[in-house]
Amino acid sequence: LQSDGDIVDLDNASPVSFSMPADNYFVAFRSRNHLGVMTASAVALSGTPLALDMTTGAVATFGTNAQKVIGSTRVCWAGNVARAVQNQLQYIGAGNDRDPILVRVGSTTPNGVAAGYYFEDVTMDGIVSYVGAGNDRDPILVNVGGTTPNNVLVEQLP
């Protein structure tokens, strides 16, 4: 998954290919710290590359509230940091997605940062931060509802 939302092969350019017979398949994907998304119906796949744009709403997705809408673009819900509970976003309570961010930056120093490729990097900017502008904690709170931090957002995969 690239920062612009494209899903490409490991060379960062080629389409993703699967060594499977041509047929109709449900297409699902998930990224390191986002909730997964799946097509609502099977898609015809073959050896010919297919552009499957799930950002416009033209391709229906499985479940309810499977994607976040920003303007007119549909994106994956960000913040699935706590890998103990792989299928939901949760801001408070046991197994929440907020606490691992604090642990990554050093627990006792919430104003610290950690640079690198980490699950806790919700904003995918290469920096994990718990406080301050562009921190990785706030998007989780916003995604679960903002004013109700005890809400849980469940991934829409079977």
Each predicted region: which residue ranges?
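Cellulosome-associated attachment modules in secreted, modular CAZymes
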Residues: 1-158
